[in-house]
């Protein structure tokens, strides 16, 4: 049997692939909210879907339920600048994430929070965390 003859679960069940992608985004950031640093329980669309935002790695960030709910359908950077917990280093991390530079985003998050934990496997460029 050749590798081309194999059938993978991801090919048969798109929901499984989507679930794996969501988990990888949380894992990539150490399961912390990109906005406030609290544990992330959800995925937030930086550019909301209601405004044409897509479910891509570059547009989806890990967020706690509080930040995700408060942001609602606003543009993330505009909303974030008005928050009491605003940190310019996190704002730069969000911008780097949007531009697809996940490595820089993680470095900026580490700078913003020295206790930020990241898997050594996540020091790569993030290309393995792309939505299909």
Which residue stretches match the model-derived regions?
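Short, charged surface segments at domain edges that flank catalytic/cofactor-binding sites
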Residues: 1-31, 88, 95-108
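Intrinsic disorder/low-complexity signal
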Residues: 4, 10, 43, 122-124
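Short, contiguous, helix-prone interaction/anchoring segments in small proteins
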Residues: 23-28, 32-38, 120-122
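Intrinsically disordered, low-complexity segments enriched in small/polar residues
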Residues: 28, 50-51, 98, 124
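Histidine-centered nuclease catalytic patch
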Residues: 32-62, 71-83
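A detector for short metal-coordination/catalytic motifs
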Residues: 58-59, 69-132
């Amino acid at each position: 049997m050749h590798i081309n003859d194999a059938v993978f679960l991801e090919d048969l069940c798109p929901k499984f692939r989507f679930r794996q992608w969501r988990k990888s985004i949380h894992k990539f950031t150490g399961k912390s909210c990109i906005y406030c640093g609290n544990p992330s329980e959800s995925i937030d669309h930086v550019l909301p879907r209601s405004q044409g935002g897509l479910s891509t790695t570059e547009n989806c960030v890990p967020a706690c339920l509080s930040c995700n709910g408060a942001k609602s359908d606003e543009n993330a950077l505009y909303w974030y600048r008005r928050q009491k917990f605003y940190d310019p280093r996190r704002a730069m991390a969000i911008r780097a994430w949007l531009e697809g530079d996940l490595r820089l985003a993680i470095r900026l998050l580490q700078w913003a929070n020295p206790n930020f934990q990241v898997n050594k496997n996540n020091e790569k460029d993030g290309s393995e965390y792309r939505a299909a």
